[in-house]
Curated annotation (Swiss-Prot):
PROSITE patterns: 4FE4S_FER_1 (PS00198), 4FE4S_FER_2 (PS51379). Residues 192-218 are annotated as: Disordered. [4Fe-4S] cluster 2 binds at residues 74, 104, 107, 110. Keywords: 4Fe-4S, Iron, Iron-sulfur, Membrane, Metal-binding, NAD, NADP, Plastoquinone, Quinone, Repeat, Thylakoid, Translocase. Belongs to the complex I 23 kDa subunit family. This is NAD(P)H-quinone oxidoreductase subunit I. Binds 2 [4Fe-4S] clusters per subunit. It is an enzyme of class 7 (translocase). Residues 55-84, 95-124 form the 4Fe-4S ferredoxin-type domain. It comes from the Bacteria. It is found in: Cellular thylakoid membrane. The keyword Transmembrane does not apply. NDH-1 shuttles electrons from an unknown electron donor, via FMN and iron-sulfur (Fe-S) centers, to quinones in the respiratory and/or the photosynthetic chain. The immediate electron acceptor for the enzyme in this species is believed to be plastoquinone. Couples the redox reaction to proton translocation, and thus conserves the redox energy in a proton gradient.
Amino acid sequence: MFGFLKKVADYTRDAADAANYLIQGLAVTFDHLRRRPITVQYPYEKLIPSERYRGRIHYEFDKCIACEVCVRVCPINLPVVDWVMNKETKKKELRNYSIDFGVCIFCGNCVEYCPTNCLSMTEEYELAAYDRHSLNYDNVALGRLPTSVTTDPSVQPLRELAYLPKGVMDPHDVPANQPRAGQLPAEVLKSLSLQQDSLQGDEGESLQDAPDQDQPKG
């Protein structure tokens, strides 16, 4: 008799624990239902990086003076600067410049300390390749302008997930139905057109009021 009651008590305790665990799991699920998604349907949806995003490095060959400051400030001495000394002008002549993005940590030190601003960080982040050797960009590849996600009609650009309202540090604190901070390119163009229309309307009203002021009073 006591053995049967013990089994019933153990079964009841296990059932209560299972129900408790189930409720805890459902609580987490329902809590995430009220949060905004943190993923996008890549590659059909792409994020618009922020202005200070550190993407692929853009290089301008004509501005480079082969000073090798970028090599000295790089934590891993990554940039390869190939130059020769011109005996007539006694100045360095740049032959080739390359950066291996398979090793680069995108710290931005080379961009920060470049004296001629020939290096700049772009918003391009799609650098995946089948061969790691193809990630070694020479001065020709580095000189290409970055591609924009907003020019492809098959891709829907999205706001950057890091754009949060003022004073908010955790993206989960923003309700799912609240729009993100920042604007899409179409919204920026629309706001600019509205501003231009309002300015033109103000100019038209000022021109109409000007002749009335010049007329003599009867």
